[in-house]
Structures are given as C-alpha cells and as structure tokens.
Amino acid sequence: MSWKRILVHIKSYRDYTPAIDAAIQIAKPLGAHVTGLYTMRELAMLKLMFGPDHKATLEAAARDQPLTEKAERAFRARCEAAGIVGDWDVAEGNASELLSLAGRCHDLIVVQQSAQGLDDLGTDIAEECAVTSGVPTLIVPNATKSQSFPKRVVVAWNHSRQSAAALRGAMPIVERAERVTVLVGEKRDLTSSVTKAPRHDIAELLNAHATNVEIVPFDPSTGGDGSRLLEAAHRANADLLVMGAYGRSAWREFLLGGATRQVMKNLDIPVLMGH
C-alpha cells in the first residue's frame, strides 16, 4: 500500500511551516497528491453568532481574504517547486473537526504541533485528529527546521489495537525505511477464555515488509511512558516515532497523564499516531 492523497493543515499565511514541508517531502517519493486545508474558526463563529451578512462578519471576511490568498499562493508555490500536485481548500469551523472530516477522504493527515498545545477551545488539534479521524496522523514539531522522508523509524509496540493501527498506518514509510527499531512493551492481558495464545510476534510482520528490523524490549516502569519513548527514539537517532494514540480512555489519560500527552508535550521529532 502507498499513500496517494495527503491532507495538510494550513493555519498561517507564512511562506514556510514545518507541516507543509513534511507533507511535501513525504509526497514526493510516493507520487502523492497534497491537499492544503486552510481552516477559519473566527469567521465561522461570527456567522453562527450574527449571520453571514452582519457587518462584523463581512469585515472579518474582508480581513481574512488577502491572508487566505497569500497562504494559497505560498502553498502552491511550494508544491510547484517540489514537482508535486497540490490542491487547495478552505473551510470554516473547528479545525480538528474539519481536518477529521476531510482526512477520511485522504490516506494521511499532517498537522503541526499546536504552538501552546491547545487551540482557543482548549483542544489540542493534533491530538484530536489522531484520536477522532480514523486516519494516520503525522504531527510535526514547531521547532523542526527542515524535513526529509523518514529513514530511521522507531515503532512503539505494546500489542494493543492502537499500536497496531499506528503501525499499519505507517507502512508506506516503514517499507522504505533504512532501519526500523521496534520497542516492544508489556503485552496486553488476555481474557480468561484464552488458555493458549496464538503466535503473535510483531517481528514476523515487520520482516515481511521492511529490511533491517531490530526488536528492543521496552520497560516504561521506571518512568513516564512518553518521556522514555522519546529518549529511546533519540538513542536510535530516529527521524520518526510511530505510536498508538491513547492506551487508556481519554478521560483517564487526561487525569493521569499518559504516553500520548507526554509525547505531545515534549515532541521534538515527528510522530505518526494511530487510534
């Protein structure tokens, strides 16, 4: 399987954002099409509060139009320079909801790490996309200066549905990686009805898809799961971390602080999440 349609979130009119660069660098070797989705929340709120023809709404639309056009020109220029097909779309509303909706008609969603972690509604856009879209979501750190197609991949594997979804979603990268390191954590408890489990060695799957696969036992018991995942990724000199989003319920993880939130908070390499 190969990605053919990649969706990237555009939330700024600046010429460069790491998410755009990451989407383009992944699209090039795959021959993929990139859609830039520019989201506008303030205008949506004004339309809902006052209506589309109210003075405040019309003034906001007039202010936004040149910024939107500038963002489109910059995006199309980046795609043209890279020799890939780029498409443009503008939507109004909550960014995570818009991205999830459009993302389901794409193979991959690429979003940038939220500047302060949260949007104006107290929601992490990247985290919401990873959990609610049903589509593999690549989250790119704000501090990233340049991007290239990932060559050294670390996969966090704990035999869960979430880690399986993330791994399968990342296969187009895993299959092309020069090295894949798998951090194998604690196995999930089986139900009481299982008296003899089937063979379930993740190395068998990865050796069928990738070359140079290394299996490394991973024990997070001595510290935070997320922090130790990032430390292990750095030791492997990884340029991509693949992991499941949420190993517990969202509410429980919000209260206790789990691997997902720890990684999101301290993100300094791109991470591909699946739920």
What is each stretch, according to the model?
Residues 12, 86-90, 115-118, 158-159, ...:
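Short, flexible loop segments at the rims of nucleotide/cofactor-binding pockets, characterized by
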